[in-house]
């Protein structure tokens, strides 16, 4: 559906390239495998920071237990959620918003929508606010990642999917959170916390976003935005 939409709505002769899945100018984009691996490594780095602070603070214990079923589920989560959601949010939605609002406002708008769609509104105001901000920052990080990869979506897929799959593995047996672990640290959500809404997650995402902005500025790309990057 989306490739056909890109071909008709955007008058693209290479709709998959416009969506960031394959490259119209492959010499300027990282290979899908390299970009996917880069995204996975960034996700692993973020989760390592969060888990390390949790362990050092005494709010969890390292168990290191994981089985084949959990690994299989993690891989499916990584590729399924990462591919589907990035194709929708950073592939299609961002391009549509760019056409209506321009590159900068389009990036903010897609991150805002991404945050609202994923936030749990049954939480208290403070917890919900932290989660909204964390998810917004993640949406901006993913947009910057696509920009830095010259329109390729594969690093975004690896980063997004890696965070989902990695946190699933941590909660499934690698890391046991204490029942009294503070929400400001592990994130809101009670027994199923989202670390992106906690202090460590927020600070880590903000630092990553600043690093990405510097990298994009240094690259001095001639055009910005999801469509132009494609």
What are these regions (language model features)?
Residues 1-6, 43-55, 196-216:
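Hydrophobic core of alpha-helical transmembrane segments in multi-pass integral membrane proteins
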Residues 12-88, 94-100, 184-185:
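Juxtamembrane helix-loop-helix connectors linking adjacent transmembrane helices
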Residues 36-41, 71-75, 104-109, 129-133, ...:
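Hydrophobic alpha-helical transmembrane segments
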Residues 47-50, 78, 82, 102-119, ...:
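Small-polar-interrupted transmembrane alpha-helices in polytopic inner-membrane proteins
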Residues 47-53, 111-121, 161-173:
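Aromatic-anchored segments of alpha-helical transmembrane domains
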Residues 84-109, 144-152:
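Membrane-interface helix/loop boundary segments of multi-pass membrane proteins
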Residues 128-187:
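Functionally important transmembrane alpha-helices
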Residues 161-230:
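C-terminal membrane module of polytopic membrane proteins
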């Amino acid at each position: 559906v989306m490739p056909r939409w890109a071909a008709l709505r955007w008058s693209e002769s290479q709709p998959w390239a416009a969506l960031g899945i394959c490259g119209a100018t492959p010499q300027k984009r990282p290979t899908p495998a390299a970009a996917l691996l880069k995204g996975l490594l960034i996700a692993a780095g973020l989760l390592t920071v969060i888990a390390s602070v949790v362990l050092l603070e005494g709010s969890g214990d390292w168990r290191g237990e994981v089985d084949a079923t959990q690994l299989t589920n993690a891989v499916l989560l990584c590729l399924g959620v990462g591919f589907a959601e990035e194709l929708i949010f950073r592939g299609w939605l961002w391009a549509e918003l760019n056409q209506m609002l321009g590159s900068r406002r389009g990036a903010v708008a897609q991150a805002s929508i991404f945050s609202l769609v994923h936030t749990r509104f049954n939480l208290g105001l403070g917890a919900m606010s932290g989660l909204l901000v964390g998810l917004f920052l993640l949406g901006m990080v993913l947009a910057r990642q696509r920009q830095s990869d010259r329109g390729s979506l594969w690093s975004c897929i690896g980063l997004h999917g890696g965070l989902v799959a990695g946190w699933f593995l941590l909660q499934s047996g690698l890391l046991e959170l204490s029942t009294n672990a503070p929400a400001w640290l592990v994130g809101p959500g009670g027994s199923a916390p989202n670390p992106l809404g906690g202090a460590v997650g927020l600070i880590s995402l903000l630092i990553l976003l600043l690093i990405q902005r510097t990298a994009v500025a240094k690259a001095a790309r001639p055009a910005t935005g999801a469509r132009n990057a494609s």
